Amino acid sequence: MKIVVNGYSGSGKSTLARRLGELYQIPVLHLDTVHWLPGWEEKAEEQERSEVRAFMDRNASWVIDGNYRKLEYERRLQEADRIIFMDFNRFSCLFRAYRRYLDHKGRARSSMTEGCEEKLDLEFIRWILWDSRTRKQKKLWRAMKETCGEKTVVLKNQRQLDGFLESLSGQKNPTEFP
């Protein structure tokens, strides 16, 4: 089973990816850990792509969370058996990011590179509320959903996420993935 978890910042991609990895006992790659070096420094693109390719090549099953179009995006979508798109509204994402900040203040969360302390600055708030939701970005999301429609699950709120997770409870066979 290969699962891609995409969506807006603060929507819960990493948490869902971790839960799916635990449920199906398959490795999880958080693309934030690939992209960032300690101190919020960006890695060289080719090194990032190489790490993602190596992860995908060495694992028959995986969960990968994060958007990062330059990091084997087309390959991830093509190889995925299931794509989950976290389409939560901007205010829900901001609230979730704020809660995450309070939970991890002064340290890195487990889905982030060590040395990248959790932050909620004006730049990130702007990203959550506006910059990640441009017409161009929405057009790209629509294209992904149309191209990969039959294997895409769109979750728009916590109730849908809870229902989705409930539908998975007790399943140990990834081929039964809804």
PLM-predicted stretches and their roles:
Residues S9:
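The conserved Walker
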Residues V5:
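Hydrophobic anchor at the beta1->P-loop junction of P-loop NTPases
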Residues K13:
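Conserved lysine of the Walker
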Residues L29-R82, F88:
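Conserved nucleotide-sensing/catalytic segment adjacent to the nucleotide-binding pocket
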Residues L16:
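Hydrophobic positions on the alpha1 helix immediately C-terminal to the Walker A/P-loop
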Residues L23, I128-P178:
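NTP-dependent small-molecule kinase module
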Residues R19:
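Active-site signature of alpha/beta-hydrolase-fold catalytic machinery across serine-
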Residues F88-R135:
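A glycine- and Lys/Arg-enriched "phosphate-lid" helix/loop adjacent to the NTP-binding pocket
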